[in-house]
């Protein structure tokens, strides 16, 4: 008997990853499905001020998916990731100063990485969020500065990539999906896509 990709039923769709993130593109390709990358046409990432911090990523993922209208035969995947340290939301740093400030906040402490994901077809939109808890060792000023100068983490929530040098030397523990910290919780996404019959 010849085995087939468990997601082969998705071949009836034209799949769009509506994200400019090279990491999400890399991660989605690990599921073995054909897709195209077309970033969502969303100019801002505003959310209602009363939105609980844990709900922000899923709200933004749904907002991005709602802005995408490619036709009935498309399946759209959007995502948004935030880092929450205490009750403070850390998005993408705008400059080196912000990146260093974020790394100082994370240094020697625990934080949460939350990724919201939306999957949209012509008939419906499904969404979820995944939470991963990450523990960081204390970082020296030189370690933080060298990382920011060398890796320029301005496209990463919380100013770090767990798969990069800072993750190797700084992350002491993780509870939850590693891929979620990179920007796409693959197991949860696979489960949702598997159920799209």
Residue ranges and their predicted role:
Residues 2-12, 50-197:
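Anionic-ligand binding patches
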Residues 20, 40, 122:
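Cofactor-binding loop segments of dinucleotide-utilizing enzymes, especially the Rossmann-like FAD-
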Residues 24, 44-46:
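Flexible, glycine-rich phosphate/dinucleotide-binding loops
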Residues 35-36, 81:
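Short, solvent-exposed secondary-structure junction/capping segments
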Residues 36-44:
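A short beta-strand-loop structural module common to alpha/beta enzyme folds
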Residues 3-33:
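N-terminal beta1-alpha1 ligand-phosphate binding loop
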């Amino acid at each position: 008997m010849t085995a087939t990709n468990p997601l082969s039923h998705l071949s009836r769709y034209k799949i769009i990853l509506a994200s400019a993130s090279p990491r999400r593109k890399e991660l989605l390709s690990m599921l073995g499905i054909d897709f195209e990358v077309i970033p969502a046409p969303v100019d801002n990432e505003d959310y209602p001020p009363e939105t609980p911090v844990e709900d922000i990523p899923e709200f933004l993922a749904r907002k991005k998916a709602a802005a995408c209208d490619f036709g009935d035969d498309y399946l759209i995947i959007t995502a948004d990731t935030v880092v929450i340290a205490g009750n403070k939301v850390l998005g993408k740093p705008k400059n080196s100063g912000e990146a260093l400030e974020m790394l100082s906040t994370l240094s020697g402490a625990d934080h949460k990485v939350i990724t919201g994901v939306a999957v949209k077809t012509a008939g419906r939109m499904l969404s979820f969020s995944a939470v991963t808890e990450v523990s960081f060792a204390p970082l020296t000023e030189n370690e933080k500065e060298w990382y920011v100068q060398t890796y320029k983490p301005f496209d990463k929530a919380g100013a770090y990539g767990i798969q990069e040098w800072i993750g190797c030397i700084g992350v002491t523990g993780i509870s939850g999906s590693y891929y979620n910290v990179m920007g796409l919780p693959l197991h949860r996404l696979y489960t949702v896509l598997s159920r799209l019959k």
